[in-house]
Amino acid sequence: MYFTYYLKMTEKKSKLAVLKTKETAESVVDFINKISKEELRKDSHIILEMMEKASGEKAKMWGSSIIGFGNKRYKSPTSGREVDWFLIGFSPRKAYLSLYLMTDHKEYATQIEKLGKFKTSGGCFNIKKLQDINLAILKDLIEASL
């Protein structure tokens, strides 16, 4: 799960580390519309719609570059520290979209295998182009994360 990885990395940096990625009041649509690469901007709008529909939640900015849906209180298994975090989310990066899903990769290995062309990093799915992805399977993985 992405969040567990993120929290562990934050805790390794400092015993008293403060989680910097928090919900903000910035406009999600304005953020997406500022993306210079047209294909990445269009793909971001598609993911935005998919995640809003699946979660029933309005998108919120988390930090300066992550779009999250929903809110959950998580407790670190190592430190016991509790923080607020989104249920699912994504971030348009320079070269790809990072999807933050709370899907158990082992449990959904068959679906993930059929998802299409992507890479994983720290529990994220990094996708260069949505046209290389099976959107029906992606929808199922998004729903499984909720």
Name the predicted role of every residue range.
Residues 2-146:
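Charge-dense, helix-prone N-terminal extensions
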